[in-house]
């Protein structure tokens, strides 16, 4: 399962971390992993390219991605994060309804 932990400080997004694999199909053929990766990486890239928000991101092995927003997020950055979370929930709900198995879990943590 892909676990995405979204960090909030005083109710505002301060970052997120993603770990794991969906397990929907074999590596290289897993459309759930691909969809989740595209949503998260595009969000990081969009915040960097389309806002003046500071972004610190680290990508690792085994589906690991960590991203923080040291100066907080602008309204545009918040909207991009909201869109990412909407996309992740829709991917998860659609595939879970098909198989009865959760592939993506989104958790929120106040830091």
Task: Kindly give the residue locations of the regions a language model identified.
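N-terminal intrinsically disordered, cationic/polar leader segments
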Residues: 1-29, 41, 45-111
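Short, conserved glycine- and acidic-residue-centered signature motifs
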Residues: 32, 36
């Amino acid at each position: 399962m892909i676990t995405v932990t979204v960090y909030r400080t005083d109710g505002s997004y301060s970052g997120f971390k993603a770990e794991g694999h969906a397990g929907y199909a074999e590596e290289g053929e897993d459309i759930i992993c691909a969809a989740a990766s595209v949503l998260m990486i595009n969000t990081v890239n969009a915040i960097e390219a389309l806002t003046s928000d500071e972004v610190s991101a680290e990508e690792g092995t085994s589906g690991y991605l960590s991203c923080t927003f040291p100066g907080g997020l602008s309204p545009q950055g918040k909207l991009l994060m909201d869109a990412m979370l909407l996309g992740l929930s829709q991917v998860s709900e659609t595939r879970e309804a098909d198989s009865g198995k959760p592939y993506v879990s989104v958790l929120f943590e106040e830091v």
